[in-house]
Swiss-Prot record:
Swiss-Prot/TrEMBL domain comment: The cysteine framework is VIII (C-C-C-C-C-C-C-C-C-C).
Reported modifications of this chain: Contains 5 disulfide bonds.
Record bears the keyword tRNA processing: no
Family per record: Belongs to the conotoxin S superfamily.
Cell compartments where the protein resides: Secreted
Protein name as it appears in the record: Conotoxin
A GO molecular-function descriptor: toxin activity
Keyword Nucleus: no
Tissue localization of expression: Expressed by the venom duct.
Length: 31
C-alpha cells in the first residue's frame, strides 16, 4: 500500500507499527 512520507507518496513505504501512525520510506528500485 502507499504511504504518505513528508508530503510525498512512497509506493514501497510501510507502516512503522500496526498501532502507530506514520511510515518509513525504504524505497529501492523506485521508478
Amino acid at each position: 500500500g502507499d504511504c504518505s512520507c513528508e508530503g510525498q507518496i512512497c509506493k514501497c513505504g510501510y507502516r512503522v507499527s500496526p498501532g502507530k501512525s506514520g511510515c518509513a520510506c525504504t524505497c529501492r528500485n523506485a521508478k
